Amino acid sequence: RSTEYTKASIEHYSKKWLEYPYPAATNVAGNEGGMEYPGIVFCSWESKGADLWGVTDHEFGHIWFPMIVGSNERLFGWMDEGFNTFINSLSTNEFNNGEYKDQPADMHQRAEAYTSPKLETIMSSPDNMKEANIGLLAYYKPSSGLVMLREQILGEERFDLALKTYIERWAYKHPQPDDFFRTIENVAGEDLSWFWRGWFQHNWRLDQGINSIKYVKNDPKQGVIISIENFEKMAMPVSLD
């Protein structure tokens, strides 16, 4: 099914973000786990099923990050692997009516690792990270941050337009992190400095709770005032139902 996976992956990214720029696409069964180059990728000959889809989709996703949007992966690995991991999650959920759809991540389970005070920040260059932390900091934490931004802060419509615009504006150029941050804010029409600061520039922890509940003028018929407090430094919107 390699050809099917290659076709579906490229068509998804071309339709959702920006058209695939090369006249051909080649997926080679090789000895390595997975590696990408312009127009050609290498995937393990042993991979099959969900594993083959995952590596094929991931390696072709790199055509968009960092080949079309030419970020400096040696300095900012998250703008390469993190962005690609994020768009892979959307592609996987859509492929063949959800054949390999991911289970929602348990962010409560991941939070301890994501916000450890011993962890370097996402903005650290990969060569300044402990090797054991590169997967988390370059792939998973930035991808989770984009999921939070899409699902909890901006909403799918605003976020998808903002990311598509970022790709279009910076295609075949070399953006820095601030170029990404400012483009998302510009298109979304919202100051997100509080989010970039907490999730990307620091490892701030999210801990929110209800501080107090009071009736308006002590009269339940007039409604209730609920006060929410941040017990840690990270901020996030809260919905009360």
Predicted segments with their positions:
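Amphipathic alpha-helical substructures
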Residues: 135-226
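Asparagine-centered strand-capping/turn motif at beta-strand->loop junctions
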Residues: 228-232
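Extended low-complexity, serine/threonine- and proline-enriched intrinsically disordered segments
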Residues: 238-241
